[in-house]
Amino acid sequence: MYISKLYREEDRGKILEFLKQNEFATLVACDGEKPTASHLLMEVMEDGEQLFVNGHMSKANPLWKTFEKNAEVLVIFQGAHTYISPTWYNHVNVPTWNYQAVHVYGSPRIISDHDETYNLLEKLIERHEAGSQYRLKTLPQDFVEKEMRGIVAFQIEVTRIEANYKLSQNRDDEDYHNVIARLNERDDEMSHGVAEAMKRQRSSHSRDVTGTM
């Protein structure tokens, strides 16, 4: 994707944290004639320096059948995003939109092994049900097997990542902090999420005022 140099994020640790916090993502592939996509829970895993994205979908979803035609697929992770009013600056300007988005590219494979699929689902449930006693192994296993027959698990070996954090980095301190304050005056979670992302961004990067919009 197009990313202005000012907004390109390359810190691996920060990108991984973002991916893990925004794991409901969009998987995009091509069916041979046109793009096709699904919105899925996508879990990022590390194996040394190599990254993988694990997921599963309904067997009725035709997207998994495109994997044999796609040497590379795209997974889009989207963070908080919101409108930025030009009235928040101390000079004349135009409206814009702040957001964080990460595009992850990689080679997909279907997980056909039963035990590998079971372990993937087991770890996923353990992570999301950490505060409860609900576990895959405590369920009736005939029920689990029936449910597993209705899904297709997959893994994507990550080949490249593009991270775009457009968070008013082109603004001076006065405008930057005023944008944060105005966002926090709103009632919606998206605005508050962008405000928090801006706080983290300015604290971890030196100021860079270029006038890029």
Predicted features along the sequence, with ranges:
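Short, intrinsically disordered, mixed-charge
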Residues: K20-Q21, K69, V75, E122-A130
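A generic structural signal for short beta-strands and their flanking turns/coil linkers
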Residues: E23, S38, E49-V53, K69-V73, ...
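C-terminal edge-of-domain segments
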Residues: I111-M213
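Short, structured beta-strand-loop surface elements
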Residues: A60-N119
